[in-house]
From Swiss-Prot:
Annotated ranges, domain Ras-associating: 175-264
Entry keyword Phosphoprotein: yes
Keyword Nucleotide-binding set for record: no
Function: Potential tumor suppressor. May act as a KRAS effector protein. May promote apoptosis and cell cycle arrest.
Protein name: Ras association domain-containing protein 4
Organism classification: Eukaryota, Metazoa, Chordata, Craniata, Vertebrata
Region of interest (Disordered), ranges: 96-161
Length: 322
């Protein structure tokens, strides 16, 4: 059966589940119609009889703990030579740079970040806070890829507190460039370019590399979360892009979330249907179930008491017959 399904007429959904290619193409057509005129439309092609679909896959952040980013880029930290750093040049730079300029990341001339962080469709985020008071150029593997740090004049206590914290906001997320800790806003969406042959582990690795996350893919998992609260983990052998197409294009109904592997668990449909009820309603459900349980207990007790009585009567009849 598996060999038959592995033919050119089927597309794998996991290592043991297949879908007809014609059915998948029909779902893909619906998916692209929903995203018509947008960059989330998917392209498809065939290579040696194998259907390959590729495009952007939206993934929502569902982390409960901050994640740690790599502090250093592939290159070493670049310090400006002390011989060329003279007071005249410092005063010249301070005149050239406005206070607002010191709050935004500046890119090195002629270079482009290897992986540009795309969160909720914004191309770049504002960095809120002041830099460290040491003149050097720091390159990090995050959205705050290049930060010029310079000397500054005396500041108000509130500004000094920001310097001590070294805490920035990147598109609504919090990033501490001293500890390299990143806290994505829950439910915010990023995306990665994938294809239908990439497994869950490969997509996880791609996403973590994009944000230069130090933790390995084994510490995270992808979940499909339904609007009802139903939550299903994508297995390592599954293909997230195929799963997205099968669940439909509307992310108000189903989203794919990145979560911690040790803090998340699946929520079956039977449990999910009770999640959104208020506590008083749930308490009333529990009371009704208790009442029903008590009625069933009484019913079963009476039934077996009647059976016991019948058996005792029969035993007495047998004894008398002897």
């Amino acid at each position: 059966m598996k060999e038959a399904c592995s033919s050119s007429s089927h597309v794998p959904v996991s290592d043991s589940k297949y879908i007809l290619k014609s059915e998948l193409l029909s779902l893909l057509k619906t998916y692209n119609c929903y995203h018509e005129g947008r960059s989330f439309q998917l392209r498809h092609r065939e290579e040696e009889g194998t259907l390959i679909i590729e495009g952007l896959l939206n993934i929502a952040w569902g982390l409960r703990r901050p994640i740690r980013l790599q502090m250093q880029d592939d290159r070493e930290r670049v310090h400006l030579p002390s011989a060329t750093w003279v007071p005249e040049r410092l005063s010249y730079l301070q005149k050239e740079a406005s206070p607002q300029d010191s709050k935004v990341p500046t890119e090195e001339p002629g270079t482009q970040p290897a992986n540009k962080a795309e969160v909720s469709g914004d191309s770049s985020g504002a960095l809120e806070g002041e830099e460290e008071e040491v003149p050097q150029l720091m390159r990090t593997k995050s959205d705050a890829s290049c930060i010029i740090q310079r000397r500054s004049k005396s500041r108000a206590p509130s500004e000094a507190q920001k310097i001590r914290r070294h805490r920035f906001s990147i598109n609504g997320h919090f990033y501490n460039h001293k500890t390299s800790v990143f806290t994505p806003a829950y439910g915010s969406v990023t995306n990665v370019r994938v294809n239908s042959t990439m497994t869950t582990q490969q997509v996880l690795t791609l996403l973590l590399n994009k944000f230069r996350v130090e933790d390995g893919p084994s510490e995270f998992a992808l979940y499909t979360v339904h609007e009802s609260g139903e939550q299903t983990k994508l297995k390592d052998c599954e293909y997230p892009l195929i799963s997205r197409i099968l669940h439909g294009p509307c992310e108000k109904i189903v989203k794919i979330f990145l979560m911690e592997a040790d803090l998340s668990e699946e929520v079956p449909h039977d449990v999910a249907q009770y999640i959104k009820f208020e506590m008083p309603v749930l308490d009333s459900f529990v009371e009704k179930l208790k009442e029903e349980e008590e009625r069933e207990i009484i019913k079963l007790t009476m039934k077996f008491q009647a059976l016991r009585l019948t058996m005792l009567q029969r035993l007495e009849q047998l004894v008398e017959a002897k």
